[in-house]
Design a protein with these regions (language model features):
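Chalcogenol-based redox active-site neighborhoods
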Residues: 1-241
């Protein structure tokens, strides 16, 4: 495992590590190969804000799984503390936590830059969104006082996956942008010729836009109709026996 201290950057591969979790040992990012995953840290078990976060994450867990995305939690606590906390959440709040929680000794937290000395020895509320290739695509940091918005994290995963698949950019508050609604932004023209062509397309109504550098299209491009070829009927007829 890479033991360097400091936060990895966007575009970096998620550091390789073997960890102990409530679901057993895991090797990251290897065990998540082919899947996206949301790796998030929380300050401590049996704390009010963290409890609300875990309940919120679990409520949305099925939606994350629909996006081929797993959740992995972490704090500097022993695994029995995680298990007991899960039991408390189930018994008192009626929610079963189904995703793994890493029991960290502090090594992982330091390697990812999750501990800020000015805020104590607990991990901050960090989020790393990692794609199916093991590349870090989004990093979010929250202070201990503020719980995370899980709907926003889910939106971020959806947006990045859609952007990758369709070669577009996502506007603010997508899919409810104040200017273009659920439509997505077409990458800006890279040359003068491309810019002129883009303006021409806007004028012809082939695409929508305010200018060559701000054009957009439907989030779901119209698919070409597939021609269904009917099987040819045989000209042969069976003779009656």
């Amino acid at each position: 495992m890479d033991t360097r201290e400091g936060m990895p950057l966007l575009g970096d591969y998620f550091p390789e590590m073997t960890v102990v979790t409530t679901k057993g040992k895991m090797t990251l990012p290897h065990d998540m190969a082919g899947k996206w995953f949301v790796f998030f840290s929380h300050p401590a078990d049996f704390t009010p804000v963290c409890t609300t976060e875990f309940v919120a994450f679990q409520k949305l867990y099925p939606k994350f799984k629909e996006l081929n995305t797993e959740l992995i939690g972490l704090s500097v606590d022993q695994v029995f503390a995680h298990i007991k906390w899960e039991e408390w959440i189930k018994e008192n709040l009626g929610v079963t936590i189904q995703f793994p929680i890493i029991a960290d000794t502090g090594v992982v937290a330091k390697s990812l830059g999750l501990i800020h000395p000015g805020k104590g020895t607990n991990t901050v509320r960090a989020v790393f969104i990692v794609d199916a290739k093991g590349i870090i695509r989004i990093i979010l940091y929250y202070p201990q006082e503020l719980g995370r918005n899980m709907e926003e994290i889910l939106r971020a995963v959806k947006g990045m996956q859609f952007s990758d698949a369709n070669g577009c950019s996502m506007p603010a508050n997508w899919p409810k942008n104040e200017l273009i609604g659920e439509k997505v932004i077409i990458p800006a023209a890279a040359t003068v010729a491309d810019a002129n062509a883009r303006i021409a397309k806007i004028k012809k109504g082939e695409i929508e836009g305010y200018d060559w550098w701000f054009s957009y299209r439907d989030a779901k491009p119209k698919q070409e109709k597939k021609t269904v070829t009917q099987p040819k009927s045989s000209s042969r007829t069976k003779k009656k026996q």
